[in-house]
From Swiss-Prot:
Organism whose genome encodes this protein: Aspergillus clavatus (strain ATCC 1007 / CBS 513.65 / DSM 816 / NCTC 3887 / NRRL 1 / QM 1276 / 107)
Locations listed in the record: Secreted
Catalytic activities: Hydrolysis of terminal, non-reducing (1->4)-linked alpha-D-glucose residues with release of alpha-D-glucose; Hydrolysis of terminal, non-reducing beta-D-glucosyl residues with release of beta-D-glucose
Gene assigned in the entry: agdC
Coiled coil: none
Name this protein carries in UniProt: Probable alpha/beta-glucosidase agdC
GO process annotations (BP): cell wall organization; polysaccharide catabolic process
Free-text function comment from the UniProt entry: Glucosidase involved in the degradation of cellulosic biomass. Has both alpha- and beta-glucosidase activity.
């Protein structure tokens, strides 16, 4: 949400990193006492000369652990001999079993040089990672390690950022330090930290490198003076905890990463519907009016959201008694539920320091962050002076559960269906050192004044009497091991990362605070704050409704966040630049970071959108996994019904999205089971085609649907790249034979978007769309068969009850087409009354002589010469195998 009030705060320039942190004066380490096993290697590392102490104190004694964890994964860990240096807690990022591999069978090989110590990771004769060009630096507040790279490498990942999908390889610094970052600027640290990169080498394969370290860091990609390419880590602490993943293809590397970071959480069927929100809905009447307007405009609305407007003076776990009184909010939620729609609200981590239940309970249980002298740490956010939950506190889950059980009680509170968590980097408007949060809040009018109380301005048919106008006015500190070394400067480390907010404590929680429990420092765990809130919130939502999958959307993330939550891409702007970059952002999270429930604020959050941009964005946004229109209080309203062309675009977009919803649900489910990305950059599908490596303006929605959006103002055409394959136009059925070149697609109105089905695909779609996903799930299916260049095609369909956390039964179908024969087989664990009502075969030039169904005899078919397709009307059960011959 908008951070415009920050202009009143003192501005601090970004810290300037050292020009050459990896000084040749540092001696490096000497490896001794090397021991090798069938799947591991250990060694002692001893400082090889006089300490350089560039940005801290050199540690004299380190340990090396190498594990061949699987045939495709290698673990290399360099840590202090006494194990006092902070390591990412296993309670936050669980570790995988590392005992299943062997050195002989591993695709990845570890080689090292003893003095000065350096190491290589190789795949066959190919060097993937090589630290021999510089000496290892391991200090109490600074780590440095550099690997050489091939010339002009294809590198991806290292989020969160709004830079191109394929990373710049000259003079590029990617800083990982989570921060509130309105406008999501380029070349800047944003809300999340994902220290994993993918190096794609075309036909030679792909590999991934994950550094499990939550400390602030600069990752530099550049060339030496003599032109040699490198990637360099510069971290403020922690250890070197590397995981190397082999991948014959980019997909394989992503799958391997999922095995370490964790498989994504499966989402409910309804969560893939259309969501509407705005910061600035003044009261419950306006929220209800928006719901009504979508219905009248015949634009399907699945879920209505409310921003912090619903709160009493912006205090979490409260309702504004005048504008969002409990009885009206409960009536609103009841109305939505009766119409098969959902309701979601925002919860921030910061709790108002005032007389309210959230604060009083937290103080009583002692779960807020404290200074080292035991006094309450205070910041300033929307409600004014605030306290911050300590997610490491032993009683924090009890506290959080209690607030959820009370405020979100289905019987007496706000019965939400999902949760939106924001400001959890954690954000703090008051600039460090923030000695007077009370004075800052007064000076900056926190909390902001609420809008005037008003009666409902117009009737809302179908809503309770409370929502109607009055009759007269009717009108139309370290406690154990792996926690952190003592004596560090936790506020001003000598090495300063390139944090665009300035000092590392600027605009966030002070980094010298010590967490309860084990005694971790905020300095080390800052990047974990949002993910720990996500984990606690998921548990709190789950104990409210233990049987169903909780939808939780967060702003701040760390590696592994996808196991708990989805992510929206933050406070973007209503312009074409942010429209375009949303594609690369989405692909990074869904394909590379294993956070597949992801999307941008459609039509833009900050600034005024316009009709053309919003119409285009409605079509593009329908291919985001998380599909939500949202903007802020000072911008013009931008609900899809505000312009007729946008309304038309939205109706068309949602119709396609809903028809494809089960196709996407199937692919998304597969990712939660195997890690195989369901949303993919073009080079994931064509890994040997160099023309796809930098393409972040097109993407695959599942394995079968290629999306090629128009991406600039006043354009009705787009140059789209088509690899050497066969494609079918979604709307016309026209066959396009790709030649590994760009093709100009023309006459694309603002309500359309180019979509093509990749040859070799069988796409199961719903026979028609619907106004809600409950209604949609009652519709039958149609199979679209798009034969590949060899005349074959295949596809899958997964069905379950759409909501249960643990499925008692499911249906998994497999479709295979070859030489006019379609076979449908599967695992029929769940009974359904749904049928396959039609089969459409694309790329045909004439009507078939005969169509035979294995269980129903002959069937009628219809040839469409304009679409070059044959459609067969069927009544095939999904509960048994079937076979169809088309001759």
């Amino acid at each position: 949400m908008l951070r415009s009030l920050l202009l009143l705060a003192p501005m601090v320039g970004a810290a300037v990193a050292a020009t050459e942190p990896n000084s040749p004066a540092c001696p490096g380490y000497r490896a001794t006492n090397v021991r090798e096993g069938h799947n591991s290697l250990t060694a002692d590392l001893t400082l090889a000369g006089k300490p350089c102490n560039t940005y801290g104190t050199d540690l004299k004694n380190l340990k090396l652990l190498v594990e061949y964890q699987t045939d495709e994964r290698l673990h290399v860990k360099i840590y202090d001999a006494n194990e006092q240096v902070y390591q990412v807690p296993e309670s936050v990022v669980p570790r995988v079993d590392g005992k299943g591999g062997s050195r002989k069978k591993s695709v990845l090989k570890f080689n090292f040089k003893a003095n000065p110590f350096s190491f290589q990771v190789k795949r066959g004769r190919e060097v993937l990672f090589d630290t021999s060009g510089s000496n290892l630096v391991f200090q109490d507040q600074y780590l440095n390690l550099r690997t050489s790279l091939p010339r002009d490498p294809n590198l991806y990942g290292l989020g969160e950022h709004t830079d191109p999908l394929r990373l710049t390889t000259t003079n590029y610094t990617r800083t990982l330090w989570n921060r509130d970052s309105y406008g999501i600027p380029e070349n800047s640290n944003l809300y999340g930290s994902h220290p994993v990169y993918y190096d794609h080498r075309g036909e030679d394969g792909t590999h991934g490198v994950f550094l499990l370290n939550s400390n602030g860091m600069d990752i530099k990609i550049d060339k030496t003076k003599d032109g040699k390419q490198f990637l360099e880590y510069n971290a403020l602490g922690g250890i070197f905890d590397f995981y190397f993943f082999n991948g014959d293809t980019p997909k394989d590397a992503s799958i391997e990463y999922a095995k370490v970071a964790g498989l994504p959480a499966m989402q409910s069927y309804w969560s893939f519907g259309f969501h509407q929100c705005r910061y600035g809905y003044r009261d419950a009447f306006e929220v209800a009016e928006v719901v009504q307007n979508y219905t009248q405009a015949k634009i399907p609305l699945e879920t209505m959201w409310t921003d912090i407007d619903y709160m009493d003076r912006r205090r979490v776990f409260t309702l504004d008694p005048d504008r969002f009184p409990l009885e009206k909010v409960r009536e609103l939620v009841s109305y939505l539920h009766k119409h098969d729609q959902k309701y979601i609200v925002m919860v921030d981590p910061a709790v108002s320091v005032s007389d309210n239940k959230g604060f009083n309970d937290g103080m009583e249980q002692g779960v807020f962050m404290k200074h080292q002298n035991g006094s309450l740490y205070k910041g300033a956010v929307w409600p004014g002076v605030t306290a911050y939950p300590d997610w490491f506190h032993p009683d924090i889950q009890k506290y959080w559960d209690g607030q959820f059980n009370d405020f979100f009680s289905p019987e007496k509170g706000v019965d939400i269906d999902g949760l939106w968590i924001d400001m959890n980097e954690a954000a703090n408007f008051c600039t460090y050192p923030c000695l007077d949060p009370e004075g800052y809040s007064i000076e900056n009018n926190l909390p902001p004044a609420a809008p005037p109380v008003r009666p409902n301005p117009r009737p809302l048919p179908g809503f309770p009497d409370d929502f109607q106008p009055p009759a007269a006015s009717k009108r139309s500190v370290a406690k154990g091991s792996k926690v952190g070394l003592p004596g560090r400067d936790l506020l001003n480390p000598r090495y300063q990362i390139r944090n665009d907010a300035g000092l590392i404590s600027s605009k966030t929680i002070n980094t010298d605070l010590i967490h309860a429990g084990e005694g971790y420092a905020e300095y080390d765990t800052h990047n974990l704050y949002g993910t720990m809130m996500s984990s606690a919130s998921r548990q709190s939502m789950a104990q409210r409704r233990p049987a169903v999958r909780p939808l939780i959307i967060t702003r701040s993330t760390f590696a592994g966040a996808g196991t708990h939550v989805g992510h929206w891409l933050g406070d973007n702007l209503a312009d074409w630049k942010h429209y375009r970059i949303s594609i690369a952002q989405m692909l990074s999270f869904a394909s590379m970071f294993q956070v597949p429930m992801v999307g941008s604020d459609i039509c833009g959050f900050g600034g005024d959108t316009n009709e053309e941009l919003c119409a285009r964005w409605a079509r593009l946004g329908a291919f985001y996994p998380f599909f939500r229109n949202h903007n802020e209080i000072t911008s013009i309203p931008q609900e899809f019904y505000r312009w007729e062309s946008v309304a038309e675009s939205a109706r068309k977009a949602i119709e396609v999205r809903y028809k494809l919803l089960d196709y996407v649900y199937t692919a998304f489910h597969r990712q939660t089971q195997t890690g195989e990305p369901f949303l993919q950059p073009m080079f994931y599908m064509y890994p040997e085609d160099k023309n796809t490596f930098s393409n972040d303006m097109q993407f695959f929605y599942g394995d079968s649907i290629l999306v090629s959006p128009v991406h600039d103002v006043s354009q009705t055409s787009v140059e789209a790249y088509f690899p050497k394959d066969i494609f079918y136009d979604w709307n016309t059925g026209d066959v396009l034979r790709g030649r590994g070149a760009k093709v100009t697609l023309s006459n694309i109105s603002v309500t359309d978007i180019p979509i093509h089905i990749r040859g070799g695909s069988i796409v199961p779609i719903r026979s028609e769309s619907a106004m809600t996903t409950v209604e949609l799930r009652k519709k039958g299916f149609e199979l679209l068969i798009a034969p590949g260049q060899d005349g074959t095609a295949s596809g899958t369909l997964y069905l379950d009850d759409g909501d249960s956390l643990k499925q008692s039964a499911s249906l998994e179908l497999e479709f295979k087409y070859r030489k006019g024969n379609l076979q449908i087989k599967g695992k029929f664990g769940m009974h359904t009354d749904l049928k396959i009502n039609a089969i459409t075969l694309l790329g045909q030039t004439s009507v078939p002589r005969q169509v035979t169904l294995s269980r129903a005899g002959k069937a009628d078919s219809k040839f469409d010469p304009a679409r070059q397709s044959v459609t067969i009307k069927t009544d095939l059960s999904l509960n048994e195998s079937s076979e169809i011959d088309i001759n």
